[in-house]
């Protein structure tokens, strides 16, 4: 019998992407506080957070296979989290305007006797944005729950000049790499 699969995330985008695999799974949100370790690189931080999220749920459900994930938007060595308010969202979008940044998504899969954690890094270039474009976007409320204050799968796509890497990773779950990793847990789509 296959072990139950759990997604340890409340992200509607991650749910949407995991649905593409057409596998039965449940959602149990991890209560891990998303604090960064200043001694870690962005890649180390995002992997550490994904692992903590998956482990927190796996510890409560030891007979399940648990997927945890985390995404960070990084510019000039600084990681941009979710904006706290509209002013911070505007500030983030001004910084991203006309520039390239990295989006790093880590996935951690935890099971009783096996675990796997990896990350995917994608480069995204933005067009130059006017103040009007920034504030019109913020008024949609779309940027308020997203790292870097934009969603590539929504109106934020209008800001993207070029993407080099996995689009789905920018959305929050590199689905192809995740499926390949799940094969190591005897799960196939």
From Swiss-Prot:
Keywords associated with the record: Cytoplasm, Disulfide bond, Hydrolase, Nucleotide metabolism
Gene3D superfamilies xref list: 3.90.950.10
Effect of deleting the gene: Not essential for cell division.
Keyword Disulfide bond: yes
Site annotation Important for substrate specificity: residues: 13, 71, 153
Required cofactor names: a divalent metal cation
Impact noted for substituting residue 82 to A: Loss of activity
Quaternary organization: Homodimer.
CC terms in the record's Gene Ontology section: cytoplasm
Effect of residue 34 to A: Loss of activity
Organism from which the protein derives: Bacillus subtilis (strain 168)
Keyword Disulfide bond belongs to the record: yes
EC number: 3.6.1.9
Disulfide bridge map: 74-79
Protein name per UniProt: dTTP/UTP pyrophosphatase
Active site: 70
Protein task: Nucleoside triphosphate pyrophosphatase that hydrolyzes dTTP and UTP. Can also hydrolyze CTP and the modified nucleotides pseudo-UTP, 5-methyl-CTP (m(5)CTP) and 5-methyl-UTP (m(5)UTP). May have a dual role in cell division arrest and in preventing the incorporation of modified nucleotides into cellular nucleic acids.
Pfam family, one: Maf
Family label: Belongs to the Maf family. YhdE subfamily.
Subcellular location, principal: cytoplasm
